[in-house]
Amino acid sequence: DMEQKQVKRVPYGVSDFVKVICRNQYYVDKTLYLPLLEDQADYLFFIRPRRFGKSVFISMLHAYYDVLNKDKFQELFGDLWVGKHPTSLQGQFLVLYLDFSQVGGNIEQLEDRFDRYCRVRLDSFVDVYRQYYSDDFVKKVLEAEDAIDKLILINDESKKLNLSTYLIIDEYDNFTNTVLNEQGEDVYWAITHAEGFYRDIFKKFKGNFDRIFITGVSPVTLDDVTSGFNIGWHISTKPEFNQMLGFSTEDVREMFTYYKNNGMIRPDSDIETIINEMKPWYDNYCFAKSALETQCKVFNCDMVLYYLRNYMNTGEAPEQMIDPNTKTDYNKMRKLI
C-alpha cells in the first residue's frame, strides 16, 4: 500500500508549479527550455491557445528565477532536467507577477480596476521583498497614489540597489479580448492606442525590468500595445519553442506508460492505440511553419489529462472526447480570428 501512495497524482486544473511538485503530482518536465529562453532577447512574448499549460509553465519560471527560492532549488528542481544543469541566473531576480485575467468590468470601470489590480500587486511586491529595501522606501511605495508612480519608484530604487527584476505577465490580452468581443473596436482602440492606459503601462514596463516574459492567447493586442518593442522578442513561432507548451507524443507515451507500470490503468492497455485514438482530437496543434514537416505536433495538456483520468476511472476513452471546459474557449477564439 505504501507503494500505491508514492504514485504521482494526475494534476488537473492546477496552475501552480510549486503545488504540483510539493503535492507529488505528475509534471511533464519543461525545464530544458530555461537555458534556451535565456539565450533569447531579454523581453519575450509567447502566444498559445488556452489549456496548453501556460500558467504552470510561467509559475515554473517564477519559482526558478525568484531570489526567495534560491535555497529551495534542490527541493523544487532536483528531480528535473535543470536540477542537473542549473543556469547562472537561477534565483537571481525579484519577480513581479501579473495576471490580467483578474481585471474586468465595463469600460468606465476598466481603467480604475486595472490600476487597482496593479497597485495591489506592486504593494505585495515590496512587501514580499521588503528585506531588500529600506522601511522608508517600502512606506513610500505603499503611500504612492497610482500604479505608475509605484512602478517608477520600484524601478528606480531597484536600479540604485543593483537588484535584478523579472516581470512576468500572464493573460496579457485577457481583458482586451473581452473588450473587443463585448464592446467593439472603438473601445478597444481607445485603451490600446495612443494615450490609452494599457498602452501607457507597457511603455513603462519597457526598459525598466531586466527581463520580461509576456504570454496570452492571441497576437491581436500584441501589435497594438507593443509597437516599439523589437520584433525579435516574439518567439511564438520559433521552431525551437514549438513544443515548449503542450505535450509531445513522447510526453504522452511516457505518462501513460508510467501509470500502466504503476497499475493505475488496465494492464492490457495498448498505449500506441490510445495515442492514435487521441491524435485526431488532441494534437492538431503546430505553431512553427518549419515544425510542420520536421517536428511532431503537440497535444493539448488539459485534454490529455481529461482522457487519462477518464481511462483510469472507467478503463476506456471518455464518451465526450472534448473536455466540456474547453468548449467555451473555442467560441471565444472564433470571434478573434
Where are these regions (language model features)?
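Walker A/P-loop-proximal flanking segment of P-loop NTPase domains
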Residues: 2-69, 74-83
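Conserved helicase/translocase motor-coupling segment
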Residues: 295-296, 316-337
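Conserved P-loop NTPase mechanochemical-coupling segment
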Residues: 12-15, 97-147, 175-188
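P-loop NTPase motor core
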Residues: 29, 63-127
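Short secondary-structure boundary/capping segments
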Residues: 61-63, 113-115, 181-189, 219, ...
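A short beta-strand-to-loop transition that corresponds to the Sensor-1 phosphate-sensing loop
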Residues: 101, 170-171, 205-230
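Amphipathic alpha-helical segments of the small helical/lid subdomains adjacent to P-loop NTPase cores
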Residues: 221-228, 235-309
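Substrate-engagement module of ASCE P-loop NTPases
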Residues: 153-160, 187-212
